[in-house]
Amino acid sequence: MPTLPRGLRFGSNGEVLNDFEALWFPERHTVDLSNGTCKLTGYITNLPGYSDIFPNKGVTAARTPYRSTVPVNHLGYRPVTTVEYIPDGTYVRLDGHVKFEGDLVNGSVDLTNFVISLAAQGGFDYQSVIGPRFSARFSAFSTKYGVLLGEGRETLKYLLLVVRRMREGYRAVRRGDLKRLRNVISTFEPSTIKGKRARAEFSQTYRDKLTGNKVEVRPSEGKWNSSSASDLWLEFRYGLMPLFYDIQSVMEDFMRVHKKIAKIQRFSAGHGKLETVSSRFYPDVHFSLEVTAVLQRRHRWGVIYQDTGSFATFNNGRLVPVKDWKTAAFALLNPAEVAWEVTPYSFVVDWFVNVGDMLEQMGQLYRHVDVVDGFDRKDIKLKSVSVRVLTNDVAHVASFQLRQAKLLHSYYSRVHTVAFPQISPQLDTEIRSVKHVIDSIALLTQRVKR
């Protein structure tokens, strides 16, 4: 048996146990650091040899000791430790040239090592965006069998509808009958009980007189409606595509049964978002700078795990092994998610509030995996900086030539965890997909028709 690095040991069954509790949750201590001095040199009206030097605002940061671990060679992973560096603001160093011309004051000044402090960097969390990817990864089955059964009747009707349309479309193309081809996508809407009976005797997808059926329908019993572009789009998005996905997921479930399980596996998912912060600063009495910075906030969650080959349910970020068939059957069907999925327009609500994601995470059946290590990592990067020069005088020219912008004391947090990201209620009003825009227009068109 190989020798393990300090902090690791073998358990009774030969498994590797991690004794890094002291490094998982180390104490943070506060440090005060200097950002040096800022230097201004150049020309300002009545001050030809202008020069000024002043200290920049210092930074206070909470940090943990920087520790690292030795990789476990025969297992292929490095145990995770907690490392954090959390400054009390967003400190950006600016080097550039300020130029302004006004009625009263003109100036041309070089700015060196001017450190500004914007809003604090921390305070963001994207677990609710990352969580659904974990739910999909560790789900016992790719197919939502409860939803499939709940929508089975409608799915079967739609499948038969597609088959009939394909058959009649083929016949129309072969005969060169464009009118009949157009009527392939027409639907009959009955208004009486007799009309419903008549609809059962012929296809709902094309006109009775064009198919050879002898069933006659009176206008009082119902009417034929031609499908619009919005009808066809919604039918494609929420009828045909889900049907294809269900077929694909059933095939994936079949292939997963024969998939070889590796001893140690990794999985991580992340999300990033751009945030804009701005503020005004006064390096000199003659002018001020309005600085706008675009920061990229990144959040990644990862786990190292072993697949046990059994099933589990989700409880507060952890997977709990299933001990009886009733619990497994309930999680497999997930009645709460089924009830939500069959609710009309529930998919529209999911665009703005993640109800479906929460019900899926809390109620579905999972593969039981033993998480041996993991991390919750957040960091911030500087994407861009823009600077605008402001003066008290009516300036004809006011410009800032940026030579360098650098993020100092950037936020970083990597916390050890063996849990999964927890999905919480989130209101999302951002437009994330062009498809959602088209869906919205199609739905509004449906409402106007009614």
From Swiss-Prot:
Stretches for region RNA-binding: 156-174, 255-265, 321-325
A Pfam family recorded for this sequence: Phage_mat-A
Domain of life: Viruses
Chief location of this protein within or outside the cell: virion
Entry keywords, A to Z: Cytolysis, Host cell lysis by virus, Host-virus interaction, RNA-binding, Viral attachment to host adhesion receptor, Viral attachment to host cell, Viral attachment to host cell pilus, Viral release from host cell, Virion, Virus entry into host cell
GO molecular function: RNA binding
Keyword RNA-binding included in the entry's annotation: yes
Biological process according to GO: adhesion receptor-mediated virion attachment to host cell; killing of cells of another organism; virion attachment to host cell pilus
One of the record's GO cellular component terms: virion component
Compartments where located: Virion
Assembly description: Interacts with host MurA; this interaction inhibits the first step in host cell wall synthesis. Interacts with the capsid protein dimers.
Family recorded in the similarity comment: Belongs to the Leviviricetes maturation protein family.
Function: Induces host cell lysis. Inhibits host MurA activity thereby blocking the synthesis of murein precursors necessary for the host cell wall biosynthesis. May be responsible for the attachment to the host pilus.
Name recorded for this polypeptide: Maturation protein A2
Protein encoded by which gene: A
